[in-house]
């Protein structure tokens, strides 16, 4: 689950991580009141959306008066901001962070991520702050330093000091930087984060180390024990189809193609998308119905897939282990009737009760194309949507 920058800073502040003073605003008048509450003569007006690249897209403004704060707020609120992370449709700005301006002396990058190679949390940092860390990793990977953290003991202060010296934090501020990183790690672990990025971490002219920006993502599987974090959820920033899918315990991610996919199991779902692309098609979604799908779940999955206007055909690829093929077949038939499906539909069933499942499809009298294998199914749906 993603949260807004200002919410991330609220979380970090509780762990002793230094952040600029700021307030959220939903209207231009609220923006002015927020500026009046800050003891600063320079203000930063920042669009709050769940995407990076806001600065380059014009979503971050520097105001030198409260009149400018109001003008920028009126300009940004309601505007659709398009960044490299939003996609071409962009995201509408519905709230702003009004923050005190900082005298920035130097920018750095600090982040915590889960590293699959080591199965541990890794602290990453770079002297190249303020730019996309992916660009740094691609062009100058030697400028990124890492510390692998032992989960038995957690981040140690000597590791944080090592990082601080490696990215050339001024010696007199290393103590502050260590405190910053230790607090960031504590927030990461206690709040079940999957990513915590500070870009940039800044050293200010008056000798402070603070987070100028903060990106925190959380493990959705752990939200049952993070009620305070769950309250930060902003449904306006999420895909309506993904919200609807979550109501039925369906794992759905919207993509840019035109072939809707309904599969059981994340691995099979990814393989299905790969083989569709292999045969020249483009998947419209990732949709995992899980191991305990019912006819109702299958029907809702169809409705969600068809709510995407780009979908020109559907490929159902099921391997029945815990899930029975006849149950899926009944769900497919019921869903096809309920939604009045007119698009091409290819179904591949394999596993438990597969013969019964195929018989249900054949006896339905519906225009359903059966496939004998995943490759056969992918080829058929790709040819049908062309």
From Swiss-Prot:
- Could you provide one GO biological process annotation from this protein's UniProt record? tricarboxylic acid cycle
Q: How does it assemble?
A: Heterotetramer of two alpha and two beta subunits.
Q: Where is the ATP-grasp domain?
A: 9-244
Cite a single GO MF annotation: succinate-CoA ligase (GDP-forming) activity
General function of this protein: Succinyl-CoA synthetase functions in the citric acid cycle (TCA), coupling the hydrolysis of succinyl-CoA to the synthesis of either ATP or GTP and thus represents the only step of substrate-level phosphorylation in the TCA. The beta subunit provides nucleotide specificity of the enzyme and binds the substrate succinate, while the binding sites for coenzyme A and phosphate are found in the alpha subunit.
Q: Name one GO cellular component term.
A: cytosol
Q: What is its EC number?
A: 6.2.1.5
Listed name of the protein: Succinate--CoA ligase [ADP-forming] subunit beta
Keyword field contains Ligase: yes
Q: Name the reaction it catalyses.
A: succinate + ATP + CoA = succinyl-CoA + ADP + phosphate; GTP + succinate + CoA = succinyl-CoA + GDP + phosphate
Q: Which InterPro entries match?
A: ATP-grasp, ATP-grasp_succ-CoA_synth-type, ATP_grasp_subdomain_1, Succ-CoA_synthase_bsu_CS, SUCC_ACL_C, Succ_CoA_ligase-like_bsu, Succinyl-CoA_synth-like
Pathway as given in its UniProt record: Carbohydrate metabolism; tricarboxylic acid cycle; succinate from succinyl-CoA (ligase route): step 1/1
> What are the binding positions for substrate in this chain?
264, 321-323
Cofactor stoichiometry and binding remark: Binds 1 Mg(2+) ion per subunit.
- A Pfam family of this chain: Ligase_CoA
Residues the record lists as binding Mg(2+): 199, 213
């Amino acid at each position: 689950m993603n949260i807004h920058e200002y919410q991330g800073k609220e979380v970090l502040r509780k762990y002793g991580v230094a952040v600029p003073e700021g307030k959220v605003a939903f209207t231009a008048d609220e923006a002015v009141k927020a500026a009046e509450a800050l003891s600063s003569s320079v203000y930063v007006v920042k669009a709050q959306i769940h995407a990076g690249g806001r600065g380059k897209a014009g979503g971050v403004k520097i105001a030198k008066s409260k009149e400018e704060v109001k003008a920028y707020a009126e300009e940004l609120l309601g505007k659709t901001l398009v960044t490299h992370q939003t996609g071409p449709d962009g995201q509408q700005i519905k709230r702003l962070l009004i923050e005190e301006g900082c005298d920035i002396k130097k920018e750095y990058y600090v982040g915590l991520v889960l590293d699959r190679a080591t199965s541990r949390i890794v602290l990453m940092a770079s002297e190249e702050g303020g730019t996309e860390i992916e660009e740094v990793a691609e062009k100058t990977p030697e400028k990124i330093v890492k510390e692998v953290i032992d989960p038995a003991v957690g981040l140690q202060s000597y590791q944080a000091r090592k990082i601080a010296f490696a990215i050339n934090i001024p010696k007199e501020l290393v103590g502050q930087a260590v405190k910053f990183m230790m607090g960031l790690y504590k927030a990461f672990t206690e709040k079940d984060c999957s990513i915590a990025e500070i870009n940039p971490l800044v050293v200010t002219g008056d000798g402070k180390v603070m987070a100028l920006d903060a990106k925190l993502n959380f493990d959705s599987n752990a939200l049952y024990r993070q009620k305070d974090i769950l309250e930060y959820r902003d449904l306006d920033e999420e895909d309506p189809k993904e919200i609807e899918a979550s109501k039925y315990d369906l794992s759905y991610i919207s993509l840019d193609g035109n072939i809707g996919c309904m599969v059981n199991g994340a691995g099979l779902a990814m393989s299905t998308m790969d083989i569709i692309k292999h045969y020249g098609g483009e998947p419209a979604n990732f949709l995992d119905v899980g191991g305990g799908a019912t006819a109702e779940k299958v029907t809702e999955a169809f409705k969600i897939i068809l709510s995407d206007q780009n979908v020109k055909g559907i490929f159902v690829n099921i391997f029945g282990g815990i899930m029975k093929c006849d149950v899926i077949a009944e769900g497919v038939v019921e869903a096809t009737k309920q939604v009045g499906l007119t698009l091409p539909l290819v179904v591949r069933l394999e596993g438990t009760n597969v013969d019964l499942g195929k018989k249900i499809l054949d006896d339905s009298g519906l225009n359903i194309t059966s496939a004998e294998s995943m490759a056969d199914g992918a080829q058929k749906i790709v040819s049908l949507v062309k």
